[in-house]
Amino acid sequence: MNETNHSRVTEFVLLGLSSSRELQPFLFLTFSLLYLAILLGNFLIILTVTSDSRLHTPMYFLLANLSFIDVCVASFATPKMIADFLVERKTISFDACLAQIFFVHLFTGSEMVLLVSMAYDRYVAICKPLHYMTVMSRRVCVVLVLISWFVGFIHTTSQLAFTVNLPFCGPNKVDSFFCDLPLVTKLACIDTYVVSLLIVADSGFLSLSSFLLLVVSYTVILVTVRNRSSASMAKARSTLTAHITVVTLFFGPCIFIYVWPFSSYSVDKVLAVFYTIFTLILNPVIYTLRNKEVKAAMSKLKSRYLKPSQVSVVIRNVLFLETK
């Protein structure tokens, strides 16, 4: 009987961000701090929104959900990448690789749809302010969040369906710090040209359609407020600037990686770091530094849990223990 298959690949080797041993400690420290900043920044937003009744509005409800998804996006691969900086051979099992593919498309797909929901929320708030609380009821907000997760699940299931049955029997080196779908499919033992086209079509449709909806929403808002007072125009511009910045930083790398046909591995690797790490750090900064309500709520939260009298007592106790 002839052997019909080569030995099946049971693990993949991740080449990581850099092959330089000298850079590994620096990269370990840098990305550990960045990941910690992502967790602290986004969990702070979630805590602030949930603890302050003044922020129990549709906009901040969606913002808190965005922060939660940002934590998920940062956590699907970053801890593994940080741990890999400490080892020479960076491997990941076949099942764990598929899990990374599943989660990255689930979370990023959900975030794209949620950003569209946030743009719709701003459209209703600015263009139809008298009907805002009726249109953006709590039930509608919950439905919008559930839709974002549902679309993300459908998107990632369809993407994973292209990969799970591919035969992997030869090369197993992935030139990235996580199992990126386009890179993994190219390692299959068969011609994956059609599969690659389906992957691009799936990701491209979700990315481009979401991005176009966002562009249309923001354009309508800007046209609507153009003839209003300078004060309302300034407030609308401030809000839109924050949203547009987040959208550009998130969608730009995703569209370039999955839609642009002339990208290279080195460029894709940098862009992957951008939308899985750097953008997620900027989101809390962008949304809080430009928002007086969030900053006021954070100050109130700090005064509640970090009272000067309590801090001084802790300091005195520490000094007393040190002098004993």
Swiss-Prot record:
Cytoplasmic-side segments: 50-57, 121-139, 220-235, 290-324
InterPro entries: GPCR_Rhodpsn, GPCR_Rhodpsn_7TM, Olfact_rcpt, Olfactory_Receptors
S-S pairs: C97-C189
PROSITE patterns named among the record's database cross-references: G_PROTEIN_RECEP_F1_1, G_PROTEIN_RECEP_F1_2
Keyword presence, Transmembrane helix: yes
Membrane topology listed for this record: Multi-pass membrane protein
UniProt similarity note: Belongs to the G-protein coupled receptor 1 family.
Annotated TM spans: 26-49, 58-79, 101-120, 140-158, 196-219, 236-258, 270-289
Cell membrane as UniProt keyword: yes
GO CC annotation: plasma membrane
One Pfam match: 7tm_4
Keywords: Cell membrane, Disulfide bond, G-protein coupled receptor, Glycoprotein, Membrane, Olfaction, Receptor, Sensory transduction, Transducer, Transmembrane, Transmembrane helix
SUPFAM superfamilies: Family A G protein-coupled receptor-like
Protein name: Olfactory receptor 4K15
Principal location: membrane
Functional description taken from the UniProt entry: Odorant receptor.
Topological domains annotated Extracellular: 1-25, 80-100, 159-195, 259-269
An example Gene Ontology molecular-function term: olfactory receptor activity
Subcellular localization(s) per the UniProt record: Cell membrane
Residues with glycosylation annotation: N2, N5
